């Protein structure tokens, strides 16, 4: 592989140099005549204090850059209750975030969540098998000096983003003018979890003068231990087909199809997150022209899941339910087609419609919802690091930067799930599926609130909390290990030119060696191993009993029993022994895979400064050539039932040109033009040749494709910026992205045999899934989901930004400032999705439009701040439109899942006791907005609904 890379480097060097020479020959050669030429080099790295100063320095840095970059500086970060990098980023135009358990977890930049996360310009590695880099939730905001979101890349930047590159800048010591010592202690109350959480951070740095040159040292520490709780309700949209329907919507005398509740579950989502993070930098100015440096960052995140869940099955009857005519129904219009859905009714009322073909061993012929409780005990333990050694040599008109770096992450994820079924304790066959007690449920959709709970009198809390009613159905024990690693070497050479147009020429090479390995231990008890909850009474835990208390008058199933997730984690080996599971776990070759990926890049960029038609102009033009060599290895079950090691290799070369131009027609106005060819390689999970068999029969089997090609796009930018006062700006930008293709999901119902899934209805002639055999193991035929290269499309948008500090207002209003951002994005995709034929008629499928994942049409944020010498305050409201979460997810029967539009209000205040100490008060999710996720269509039936904490914190900050 390395020989291929060396040959490629030799063959492409001449091409890259030729590109820049050609660009030089067509440039306009005139001297610049601007009075103040602002360049990137003119803005030094400084430590800033206060909201106003941080905004001013960030804006000056943005203005100086030739390529479009959004910047947020340290005190701007610290003045809001932002916990991690994702939450900081939602202040930026064109950026939207999503939250998990109320904490920022996913970021979309200009309609794409396929971004690249760097620390000081270097690669980071994820906790799992995705691309992009370190998880946003793993990187605390307290380590950050500044955040750069590069929307238009240059040739010297590492490829890998379709949205933007997010570069996290940490502190460095050589440019400190005085010692830096900042300590922050915060105590936070989480409302749903009803817990006080602790947060500590500190940054210490200094510059020392020695006989052998100046030395700058700085380090930042962060630690938090917090509980969060997000309760979730899931009700998958099911289908009542026309042949089984008794509801006539169009008056033709025939039953019509509609959406109705399918499988579901509810969950008390308690988590304990402990994060310890460190970053440090050591710089040595050996000589005036030579600097050496060493930098490192490290995070250690432990996320303990203490969730309790109740699985809600579907009624047994495949005919129309009793009382359906008494229900209420609604119709939504999608792409000109009317889609009917049930909006309220009793699900599973009566005696299975008076059927006489039930087997005689069914103890409870009443129809209704099957109840299965389970714990969600699991940990994610991740250690991530980034380290670099390098130097910078300045010699006359030559600058050389050389560096070696390493990034890695080691993750262990555990999951121990015990499932109990709500059964009749008096049944002779108590430990069996047929002893189940079915409970009719009330279903009601009311705007953006979903209600789903047992009919009054159908079941009592005393029964649900009696361990004698619960029979263990199955226990699943799983442990996954992820090892991510990347090594990189680069040399950048910059010539500063004595030329009328070209100011510098940068040439560089970079090589990287990337690997990811996943291994998994997996074991499962037989169905109905013969334990009741009473047999494991010392491990039991009752649910909190306050599910979705925000909706006080609604009906939900609040009370039930599960095994205690915390005890399971601490006594896992003991439980394995009780349940006759292997004490150390069993390696599952069908769940492991590895990907090795080597890259080599060569790049050339020319920076120019001139005039065009008498207008001062500056910018850059360049090209990046990148060679990729991949090998994906894993295991595969062939048609003859044998298990074999498999590996697939591929390589490809891409050329990525880019250019930026900044015009300054008058002193306070800039016009930006940008172009870049960008690419994103498939996620490692998508490249896996190993078939991933989940234990849950309701989940599809994911099958990777090691021949997937990268996604490529061309993007164009135009922006007008008016810097009307220091620290103030009004800007309007337009962007357009033309995607050659995207990687999406293809769903094939009944497309694969899963030998790991357990069918709860095995033996039931009505409900059991079709069976199969693979590798000598009995299995169940389930849905297959595979990644595929899908047609592309276009994304275009407008970004409007306004920032202003009011300086001449009368007291007490002097000190007010405002930041407002608005984004509009429009996606046009060369792909639709088909609903099953029940919507359009017999054996027909209806086509509906499908947008890009993570793209919200409209989003905005508005921040009002007030700063005086003694105190400051901020309040920020953010909003984003609905967006597509996934083209194909199990919760909506292999059809799309959306997130509804949502806003959030955060606020912060601080009061300076003296020059050293300040008291802080912060609030997050003050309006306690719920997350609502429709299935199938953006305005379809609610498939998921969740409620996360409102968090209030008090703290003290010291700066010495």
Question: What feature does the model see in each segment?
Answer:
Residues 193-358, 382-390, 396, 657-660:
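Transmembrane beta-barrel wall of Gram-negative outer-membrane proteins
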Residues 124-151, 202:
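Short acidic/polar hinge/loop motifs at secondary-structure boundaries
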Residues 380-384, 591-597, 679-739, 760-766, ...:
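Outer-membrane beta-barrel signature, preferentially recognizing the C-terminal barrel domain
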Residues 173-180, 209-215, 289, 396-401, ...:
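Short loop/turn motifs that connect adjacent beta-strands in outer-membrane beta-barrel proteins
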Residues 529, 740-741, 816, 878-890, ...:
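C-terminal beta-signal and adjacent terminal beta-strands/loops
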Residues 86-124:
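Extracytoplasmic beta-strand/coil segments of soluble accessory domains associated
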